[in-house]
Amino acid sequence: MAREALYGRMGDLTDSVYAMATLFALDRHGARETLQKAARSSGELLILDRYVASNAAYSAARLGDAGVIEWVRELEFSRLELPVPDLQIFLDTAPEVAAVRAADRASTDASRAKDEYEKDSGLQRRTAEYYSRLAEEEWAGRWIATADGDKIIRAVQEIVGSGSGTEDSRS
């Protein structure tokens, strides 16, 4: 349902930050059992694109209020019992670069049209700022903030090799 709302197919639902955050959380909650099983499996690597931190960053950027960040944490990790990640990766890319990539995807793949959030360059800039803050604060666990693929691979290898997320490879 969140995807439908992002493409304007659910009326004015996108006007409510809390409604959209709840829809995104419920989408993840629908996959909770699968996520929890994968998180408990030894030797398994679970990679998710736009997990809980995305909800926190976008919600804070839309409201202009960091207070919603803890509301998202409570909703998703406590109430909905989603697993906390061992590592969160913020691909620290300039919003302008991300906008060009999104436009390229939209022009070459009809299924990748820009959604309501992607169309708003101010929102994208503010969201990137909140992501940077979340990474700096190590919100909900360990982070690496970089666009360097080698650093990301090393951080993931440390987790997979050790079986835990205790080493510090933040850069």
Where do the language-model regions lie?
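ATP-dependent small-molecule kinase phosphotransfer cores
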Residues: 1-80
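Short beta->alpha linker loops
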Residues: 27, 51, 93, 147-151
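Hydrophobic/aromatic beta-strand patches that form the interior of the parallel beta-sheet core
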Residues: 47, 87-89, 142-144
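NTP-dependent small-molecule kinase module
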Residues: 96-171
